[in-house]
A protein has these predicted regions:
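Catalytic cores of the polymerase beta-like nucleotidyltransferase superfamily
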Residues: 1-505
Length: 505
C-alpha cells in the first residue's frame, strides 16, 4: 500500500467574536492499492512522472475529512509519458489500446484494468460535449487546468504527496464547488458539467461558488444542454436523486435546496425537463410552499429523508411530477365562491408526463409503467382493513407498488399544511403497509397462479387430469377464491376445495 501524509492548513474564523482568522491543521493520508503503487513507481523508475488523479483523490480526502464512505472503484493515472512510452514500460503486461487517440492506454494487472493517460489539453468543443482537438502537454499543471472542478484537479503520488495547484483541497474542506479557471469556458466546453456541479452540491451538501453559480444560470451556457443525449441526462439525474440522507436532515437544509432549485436553476432544469414550467406558477393552498413545484420538491426531499436509500428512481420521478397535469384538470364547481377541484388529475398528469418529460429521458419500460401507475393512484385513499388492502394490492399488481405508493403518501403528507393529527395519520399509513406485507408474506393475497400453495402437478394427481381448459379454469377459480377471502391459501384447504368442486369434471 502506498501512503503519504499531508498537512492541510485551513484558514478559519475559529472564534465568532473575533474577526482574526486562525489556521487549522488537518492531516490527510492517501492509501493506494498495491497494483496502483506498482504502476506509479514503475513509470517513475523509468524516468517519467506519474500520479493518480480525479475522483479517487477527491473521495479519499472527503472520506477522511467528513467521515463519509464514498466507494473508490477506479484509480485514474496521469503521466508525462506518451502512449507509445507507456506501452514500452508495460510491454510485459496485457495492454488494451482502445483509447490511444485520446492518449489513454489500459493495462491489465491481476485481472483488473487501469487507465493511464498522457498529460493533455483539449480544445474546440464543437458539440459542447467532446473535444475535437487533443494535444499532449509537458506539465501536470497544464493537464489539471483542463479539468472541470478544483476538487477534481488534485493529483497524488507516494513520493511527492498531493499536488494541488488550484486549491481543491481547501475547497473540499470548505465544501465549495468551484470551476477550474473561467467557469463559463469550462461549462461551454462540456454542458453536462452543469448537471455535475448541481449533483455534487445536492448530493454532498456542498455550496456552489458564486461565479460558478452565475455561469450555471447563464442561458448562453445551459442552452447547450439540449445537445446532450437523453442517456447522459438520465444518468446524471439518477445520480442526483441518490443522496446521503444526513445531508438533508433539517428543514432548513430542505428549504435551502428547494429555494436553490426553484429560484436559481429552474430555467436550466426546464431546458432538459420542460415539465418543470407546468408547475412553476401554479399555487398550492395545502402545502408549506405557496407554489406547486415547491410542494413537489418538498415531497421529493421528504421521500429521500424518511426512507434513506430504500426508494426507487421511479418513486422520485413521481414525487416530482405527480401534479404536472393540475393546470389542465382544474374545474370550478362553484362560480360564486370560486371553489375548484381536479377530476381526472391522475390521467391528465400521466398525459403531460408522457408529452413533456418522457421524451427527454431514457427510461426502461418497467420504470415507465411504474411511474404512470403511481401517478394514477397517487391520491388514492388508503383504508386499513384486510378487504380494502387486498383489493388495492391486486389493483396495483405487486407489494412493491404498494410500498412505493405508501412512501409517496407519507412524503406528501409531511408537507401538508393542514395536518391536524400528523403522527396519527402517518401511523395509520404505516399500519396499512404492514398489513399489506403480512397479507402477501402469508400468501393471503396471490398476484399470480404461481403464488398458490398448490402446483399443477398436484391437481393432475388429485383429479387424474390432463392439462387443458378445465385445468386452467380450476387454477383461476382457486386464485379468485383466495383473493376474495373465501379460501385460505394452504395446500390442505385448496386440496379440499378441488375435491369438493371439481372431482367430477
Amino acid at each position: 500500500m502506498g501512503t503519504q501524509e499531508t498537512i492541510l492548513n485551513v484558514v478559519t474564523n475559529a472564534n465568532n467574536n473575533s474577526s482574526e482568522p486562525t489556521v487549522k491543521k488537518t492531516t490527510v493520508e492517501m492509501f493506494l492499492p498495491h497494483d496502483v503503487t506498482f504502476i506509479l513507481l514503475r513509470l517513475v523508475n523509468k524516468g517519467y512522472a506519474a500520479y493518480v488523479v480525479g475522483g479517487c483523490v477527491r473521495d479519499t480526502i472527503c472520506n477522511q475529512l467528513f467521515e463519509t464512505n464514498y466507494p473508490i472503484h477506479d484509480y485514474d493515472i496521469t503521466t508525462d509519458a506518451t502512449p507509445k512510452q507507456i506501452m514500452e514500460v508495460f510491454n510485459a503486461y496485457k495492454i488494451i489500446p482502445t483509447g490511444l487517440k485520446h492518449g489513454t492506454v489500459t493495462v491489465l494487472l491481476n485481472n483488473k484494468t487501469y487507465e493511464i493517460t498522457t498529460y493533455r489539453k483539449e480544445s474546440d468543443y464543437s458539440d459542447h460535449r467532446h473535444a475535437d482537438k487533443i494535444e499532449f502537454v509537458g506539465t501536470l499543471k497544464e493537464d489539471l487546468s483542463r479539468r472541470d472542478l478544483t476538487i477534481n484537479a488534485i493529483a497524488y503520488n507516494p513520493l511527492e504527496g498531493f499536488v494541488d495547484p488550484f486549491n481543491g483541497m481547501l475547497d473540499i474542506y470548505n465544501k465549495t464547488i468551484r470551476c477550474v479557471g473561467n467557469p463559463n469556458e469550462r461549462l461551454q466546453e462540456d454542458a453536462l458539467r452543469i448537471l455535475r456541479v448541481v449533483r455534487f452540491a445536492s448530493t454532498r451538501g456542498f455550496t456552489i461558488e458564486e461565479e460558478t453559480r452565475k455561469a450555471i444560470c447563464n442561458p448562453d451556457n445551459y442552452k447547450w444542454l439540449k445537445h446532450i443525449s437523453r442517456e447522459r441526462i438520465t444518468d446524471e439525474l439518477r445520480k442526483m436523486l441518490k443522496v446521503n440522507p444526513c445531508l438533508i436532515d433539517t428543514s432548513e437544509k430542505v428549504d435551502d435546496l428547494i429555494g436553490m432549485l426553484h429560484c436559481d436553476y429552474l430555467d436550466m432544469f426546464n431546458t432538459i425537463l420542460p415539465g418543470f414550467y407546468l408547475m412553476y406558477d401554479y399555487t398550492s393552498s395545502y402545502s408549506n410552499y405557496t407554489f406547486m413545484l415547491g410542494h413537489n420538491l418538498a415531497t421529493l426531499f421528504n421521500l429521500r429523508r424518511e426512507f434513506s436509500s430504500d426508494y426507487s428512481f421511479s418513486t422520485c420521478m413521481v414525487a416530482l411530477f405527480h401534479d404536472v397535469g393540475k393546470h389542465f384538470a382544474k374545474r370550478i364547481y362553484d362560480d360564486y365562491t370560486g371553489a375548484d377541484d381536479f377530476p381526472n388529475l391522475g390521467e391528465k398528469s400521466v398525459e403531460l408526463f408522457r408529452r413533456s418529460v418522457l421524451p427527454c429521458l431514457r427510461l426502461s419500460n418497467k420504470e415507465i409503467k411504474e411511474i404512470e401507475l403511481l401517478i394514477l393512484h397517487y391520491d388514492d385513499i388508503i383504508v386499513c382493513n384486510k378487504q380494502f388492502i387486498t383489493e388495492k394490492l391486486l389493483e396495483l399488481g405487486s407489494l412493491e407498488a404498494f410500498k412505493q405508493l405508501y412512501q409517496l403518501q407519507v412524503a406528501d403528507y409531511l408537507d401538508n399544511l393542514y395536518s391536524s393529527n400528523p403522527k396519527e395519520h402517518l401511523t395509520y399509513l404505516e399500519n396499512s403497509y404492514k398489513l399489506a406485507c403480512e397479507l402477501v408474506n402469508n400468501k393471503e393475497v396471490c398476484f399470480q397462479i404461481k403464488d398458490l400453495n398448490i402446483s399443477g402437478d398436484d391437481i393432475i394427481e388429485l383429479l387424474n387430469l390432463e392439462p387443458g381448459p378445465v385445468f386452467c379454469e380450476i387454477l383461476k377459480k382457486l386464485l379468485d377464491e383466495v383473493n376474495l377471502g373465501n379460501l385460505k391459501n394452504t395446500k390442505e384447504e385448496l386440496t379440499k376445495y378441488i375435491l369438493d368442486n371439481f372431482n367430477e369434471k
